Every structure is written in C-alpha cells, then in structure tokens.
Amino acid sequence: MGTPETSREPCPDRILDDIGGAFGMGAVGGSAFHFIKGTYNSPKGSRFVGGTQSVSMNAPRTGGSFAVWGGLFSTFDCTMVYLRQKEDPWNSIIAGAATGGFLSMRQGAGAASRSAIFGGVLLALIEGAGIMLNKVLAQPQNMMMEDPGMQGMPGMQGMQGMPGMPGMQGMPGMQGMQMGQMQSQAQIRSESQNQNTASSSSSSSWFGGLFDKKKEEVQPGSESKTEVLESFDAPPVPSFEFK
C-alpha cells in the first residue's frame, strides 16, 4: 500500500520540510523572545550586550526543540496516513496527541497523558480554525461562479469584485449589450469563414481554369483530327486484271 496523494509533500520530504520549518520558526521566535528577556534582565548600560548573549545561548536550543517536535509530528502524521489510507484532520489530531505523549514519557504516565490531551486539543483547534478559514474564503468564489448573467461578458468578472457593482446584472441595457457583442462576434466569424472559402475557391478556380483551358484547347484539335480522317477517302484498290 502506498501513501495517497495529498496537497502536501510526500512523507519523506514532508518530514524534512516540517523539521526545517519548525527549526526556523523556533529560531526566529526564540531569538525575539530571548533578546527581549535578556535586555530586560540585564543591568543598565549593557542591555544590548545581554540581549545578544541571551539570544546566542538560548535561540539554537529553542529551534532544536521545535525541530524535534515537528519531526515527530510529521512522522506520526505519515504513519496515520499510511495506516488509514486517507488524508483528513483526524491524522493531525492523533499525531499531535502522540507527539505530546511521546515527548513526556520520561516524566511518567500522568504527565504523558496530560501532554497527549493538550497536544490533541491544540491540533484540533488549529485544524478547526483552518477549516473555518477555508469555508469563509470559499464563499465569495462560489457566489461569483453561481452568477450566470455576468460570466459571459468580457471584463464583468473583474467588475463583480468591485463595491457597488452587484446590481449591474439587473440593468436593462446589460442584456442588449451582451446580445450585440454576441452578434458582432458571430458576424466576424462568418466573414472570416467566407474569406477563407473565397480564397480557397479562387485558388481552386484558378488551377481549374488552367486545366479547363488545356482541355478546351485539346478537345477542338482532337475533333478536327477526327473530322479530317472521316472526310478523307481511301484510294481505290488496284486490280491486275487485263482489259
């Protein structure tokens, strides 16, 4: 059984991609957090130096922790995709719970179970927010696609997104403009077809005229030859009888 096709990267590449992305997020976010913390905790006159030292000491560790979490999450996610043979939010929720529980196993069963519940709830909230955001973004597109009167006219699709333009469909002149444009397009197409047929007929008539002339020139000659042969009388057969 193979991994089903999804919009994300395949599982080996997905794991590496998530590890790199999580490390980048942890490094950038950790740098900002530890710089502010080091600046606040440093004495006056050396706050900037204290902030940079705090970043250099703690930001790589934070990025590594994020990378470990992202790698384990992607591994569990790919495992669920392989076992269930489908891609849905439940894979991410189960992977988040498994990751939280796995990272807290050294602290005991109670801490591992609490971390698993926290990871599952966190991933459920993230997946729910993503689904709601996709629905909200998909509604305007569906409304534009379901509008049958404005799709046929060129440039109306861009005008639908402008404020104050939803009432353009009900105007009495819009249908007449659309019919006029359709008729003009049909006339242009018919004229182009007529020009093509006229050019092809003229070329064929030109070649046909040449061949017809040759035929006409050949046919009178052949008729004259036959007429001359028919009018010519054969000579009498000589006889050798003595008279």
UniProtKB/Swiss-Prot annotation:
UniProt note: phenotype after gene disruption: Lethal when homozygous.
Q: Where is the composition biased (Polar residues)?
A: 184-198
Q: Where are the sequence repeats?
A: 149-151, 152-154, 155-157, 158-160, 161-163, 164-166, 167-169, 170-172, 173-175, 176-178
Give the residue spans that cross the bilayer: 19-36, 66-83, 90-109, 115-137
Q: Which family does it belong to?
A: Belongs to the Tim17/Tim22/Tim23 family.
> Biased composition, Basic and acidic residues: where in the chain?
211-228
Its gene is TIM17-2
Name used for this protein in its record? Mitochondrial import inner membrane translocase subunit TIM17-2
Q: How does it assemble?
A: Component of the TIM17:23 complex at least composed of TIM23, TIM17 and TIM50. The complex interacts with the TIM44 component of the PAM complex. Interacts with TIM23-2.
How does the record say this protein sits in the membrane? Answer: Multi-pass membrane protein
Q: Which cysteines are joined by disulfide bonds?
A: none
Q: Where is the composition biased (Low complexity)?
A: 166-183
Q: Which GO terms describe its biological process?
A: protein insertion into mitochondrial inner membrane
Which species is listed as the source? Arabidopsis thaliana
Tissues in which the protein is found: Expressed in roots, flowers, leaves and young cotyledons.
